[in-house]
Structures are given as structure tokens and as C-alpha cells.
Amino acid sequence: MKTENAKTNQTLVENSLNTQLSNWFLLYSKLHRFHWYVKGPHFFTLHEKFEELYDHAAETVDTIAERLLAIGGQPVATVKEYTEHASITDGGNETSASEMVQALVNDYKQISSESKFVIGLAEENQDNATADLFVGLIEEVEKQVWMLSSYLG
């Protein structure tokens, strides 16, 4: 039987996973919008990059949701829930390519920071699989921060 502290830790892990699931869903939506609306001399490069990133975001949404189910949690699954649980926004004010890229840098930095928190919670809960999942995500996210920041100059 789980102790009260273990149940609390498990709930914290599940809540944090739902926040990240929601962040990745909003990021997926934002990336689609950027993919469709990017304009300017870097259209072809960014159009392709945004597609690559939204494909990765879609995979990440599925991976986090399945991890939640595997540990007995319930992933949020509606747009309303995603919006309520996310710590990033869906934006909407970005019109230039550089504004779009800067918004992504900011979102990825937020996700990276919060993912480190998830790792700590998972490790406290002896949930090595969740911790490992987020270690891998941080590696990819930090790479994207570097690449997108380099684009901005």
C-alpha cells in the first residue's frame, strides 16, 4: 500500500506530466500556424523547419500521454484542458518570421526548465522511465533552442 507521501508524489508527477502534455499540444498547434503563415525571404527554410518541429511535437504529445497512462494517470485530452494546464500560451501575435522563431525559443526554454522539474519529481518517486523520457526530451529541446537562437543571430 502506498504511503500518503508516495501518493502525493505520484499526483505531482501526473500533474507535471499533464502540464508538459498541454505545453506540447499548444506548441504543436502554434507550429502549424507558423508553418502556414510564415512569409519572407526565409519562407522555404522555416516552412520546412516548422513542419519538422510540429511532427516532433505530435510524437511528444503521444509519448507523454502514453507515459501518463502507463503510470496509472489520466492525460488531459481536450483543447480546454490543454489551455487550462499549459504554462505556455498559444500566442497569436507573431507576424514576422523572427517573432515566430523568438516565440519558439521562449517556449522551448520554458519547456526545458519545467522538464528538469519533472525529472526531479520522477526521481523522487523512483520513476526512472519518466525521468529518462524527459532527459531525452531536454536534449532535443536544448538543441532546438541553440539552432533557433543561431537563426536569430
From Swiss-Prot:
It comes from the Bacteria. Keywords: DNA-binding, Stress response. InterPro entries: DPS_DNA-bd, DPS_DNA-bd_CS, Ferritin-like, Ferritin-like_SF, Ferritin_DPS_dom. Disulfide bonds: none annotated. The keyword Transmembrane does not apply. CDD domains: DPS. SUPFAM superfamilies: Ferritin-like. GO terms for molecular function: DNA binding; ferric iron binding; oxidoreductase activity, acting on metal ions. Induction: By oxidative stress and by growth in minimal medium lacking iron (Fe(3+)), or one of the divalent cations manganese, copper or cobalt. Forms highly stable, multimeric protein-DNA complexes which accumulate in stationary-phase cells and protect against oxidative killing. Belongs to the Dps family. This is Metalloregulation DNA-binding stress protein. It comes from Bacillus subtilis (strain 168).
